[in-house]
C-alpha cells in the first residue's frame, strides 16, 4: 500500500503542525499496524488457560509471563523514545516488528515455561520499539489535531487487543498452542505496512533536515510540570492495575465463579476489550474540544461506582458492568498522553515512551501482584481489592488546566 500523503513539518513543537493538513491515510496505516501489533500481544493473554493446562502453571507463574512481557516493553520504551527524539530512526518500526514475529514463532514451538517467558520477552521488545515511534508518527500526521490523531492510533491497538481473544477462541483453543504460528501472517503484514510508513517518515525527516527548529516554550513552571506528570503516572497506575485484573484474570474469574467454558469466558473478555476499543475513540476528540483534564477526571473517577458493584454482580450484570467499565476507562489514555506531550513539548518520543512504558510496566506488575493474591486467597478477592483503584481519580483536581487553541 503506497503512502502518498504530502510531507508535513515534523512536530517538534506544537506550533509546527498547526497549519498542516491531517494525513488520514498515514493515521489509518499506523492504526492498522497498531491493531496487528496489539492483536499479536493479546494472544499471549488469551491463551493463558492453555498454557496453564500444558505446563501446570500457578497464578503466580501466569503473572510472571505478563510481567516478563511488560517489563521487556516498559524498560526499553523511554530509552527508545529519548534516543529517537535526538536521532530519528524511521526504519526502526519494521525492525521492531521482526522481534515480535520471532517471539510468535517461539511461542508456537515452546516446550517449556522458560521458552514461553523468552517468547513473551521478544514480543515485549518489539512493542518497546513500536509504541513510542508510532505515537510520534501519529502526531506528525495529526495536522495539529493531536487528540484525534492519538485516538485513531489508539483505537487500532484496542481493537487489536479485543480481536486477539476472539481469534484465539476460534483458531487456537480448539487445536492447541501450535496454531499460534498462523499469526505469523499478521506480523508479516504489519512489517509490510510499517515499511511504507517508514518511507513517509523518512521523507518527513529529509524535508525538515537543515531547517531552523521552532522555539520550544514550556507552558508551565518546572515544579508544576513535575507535579502534573507525577499525578498522571499515579492515574496510569490506577488504570492499568485495574486493567491487568481484567485482561489477565477475567476468564479465570468467570470460569471459577460462574462455571463458564474457556471459549465462553474468552467471548466475555472480547466484549470487554471491544468496549475498550470503542471508548478510546471518544477520549482524544472530546479532549480537543473541552480539555484533557476533564476527560481524565471523568474516565478514571467515573468508573468507580461500577467497579465497586462488580464483585457482587450476577453473570449477566458482570458482563454489562465490565463493558461499561471498559468503555469509560479507555477514554483516559489518549487524553493523558496528549496532556503530557503538551506539558513537555519537543520531547514527543520520550513522553510517549515513558507513558507507554509505565503503563505496560504497571500492567505487568499488577498481573504478578494480583496473581500472588489470587494464589493465596481467591480470584474474587482480587476484584474486591481492585474496585477501589479508580478512586485515585480524585487526584485529577490538582492537575493544571492547560487548555489552549491549536
Swiss-Prot record:
The chain crosses the membrane at residues 43-63, 64-84, 103-123, 152-172, 178-198, 226-246, 267-287, 295-315, 320-340, 354-374, 379-399. Disulfide bonds: none annotated. Residues 1-42, 85-102, 173-177, 247-266, 316-319, 375-378 are periplasmic. It is found in: Cell inner membrane. One of its GO terms (biological process) is DNA damage response. GO terms for cellular component: plasma membrane. Its main location: membrane. It is a multi-pass membrane protein. It comes from the Bacteria. Belongs to the major facilitator superfamily. This is Fosmidomycin resistance protein. It comes from Escherichia coli (strain K12).
Amino acid at each position: 500500500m503506497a503512502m502518498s500523503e504530502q510531507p508535513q513539518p515534523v512536530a517538534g513543537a506544537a506550533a509546527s503542525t498547526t497549519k498542516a493538513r491531517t494525513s488520514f491515510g498515514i493515521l489509518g496505516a499506523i492504526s492498522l499496524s497498531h491493531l496487528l501489533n496489539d492483536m499479536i500481544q493479546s494472544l499471549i493473554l488469551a491463551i493463558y488457560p492453555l498454557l496453564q493446562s500444558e505446563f501446570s502453571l500457578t497464578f503466580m507463574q501466569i503473572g510472571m509471563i505478563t510481567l516478563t512481557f511488560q517489563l521487556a516493553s516498559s524498560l526499553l520504551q523511554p530509552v527508545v523514545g529519548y534516543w529517537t527524539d535526538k536521532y530519528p530512526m524511521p526504519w526502526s518500526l519494521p525492525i521492531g516488528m521482526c522481534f515480535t514475529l520471532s517471539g510468535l514463532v517461539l511461542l508456537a514451538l515452546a516446550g517449556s515455561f522458560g521458552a514461553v517467558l523468552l517468547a513473551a520477552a521478544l514480543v515485549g521488545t518489539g512493542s518497546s520499539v513500536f509504541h513510542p515511534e508510532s505515537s510520534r508518527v501519529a502526531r506528525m500526521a495529526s495536522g495539529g489535531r493531536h487528540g484525534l490523531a492519538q485516538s485513531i492510533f489508539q483505537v487500532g491497538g484496542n481493537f487489536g487487543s479485543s480481536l486477539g481473544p476472539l481469534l484465539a477462541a476460534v483458531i487456537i483453543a480448539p487445536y492447541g498452542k501450535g496454531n499460534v504460528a498462523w499469526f505469523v501472517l499478521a506480523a508479516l503484514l504489519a512489517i509490510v505496512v510499517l515499511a511504507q510508513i517508514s518511507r513517509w517518515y523518512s521523507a518527513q525527516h529529509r524535508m525538515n533536515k537543515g531547517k531552523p527548529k521552532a522555539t520550544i516554550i514550556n507552558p508551565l513552571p518546572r515544579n508544576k510540570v513535575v507535579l502534573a506528570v507525577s499525578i498522571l503516572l499515579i492515574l496510569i497506575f490506577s488504570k492499568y492495575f485495574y486493567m491487568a485484573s481484567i485482561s489477565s484474570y477475567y476468564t479465570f474469574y468467570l470460569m471459577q465463579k460462574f462455571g463458564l467454558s474457556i471459549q465462553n469466558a474468552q467471548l466475555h473478555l472480547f466484549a470487554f476489550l471491544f468496549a475498550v476499543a470503542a471508548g478510546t475513540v471518544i477520549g482524544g476528540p472530546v479532549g480537543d474540544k473541552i480539555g484533557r483534564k476533564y476527560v481524565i477526571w471523568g474516565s478514571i473517577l467515573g468508573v468507580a461506582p461500577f467497579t465497586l458493584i462488580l464483585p457482587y454482580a450476577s453473570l449477566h450484570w458482570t458482563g454489562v458492568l465490565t463493558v461499561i467499565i471498559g468503555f469509560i476507562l479507555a477514554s483516559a489514555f489518549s487524553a493523558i498522553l496528549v496532556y503530557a506531550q503538551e506539558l513537555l513539548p519537543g520531547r514527543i518520543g520520550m513522553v510517549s515512551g515513558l507513558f507507554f512504558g509505565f503503563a505496560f510496566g504497571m500492567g505487568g506488575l499488577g498481573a504478578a501482584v494480583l496473581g500472588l493474591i489470587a494464589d493465596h486467597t481467591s480470584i474474587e478477592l482480587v476484584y474486591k481489592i481492585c474496585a477501589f483503584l479508580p478512586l485515585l481519580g480524585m487526584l485529577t483536581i490538582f492537575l493544571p488546566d492547560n487548555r489552549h487553541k491549536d
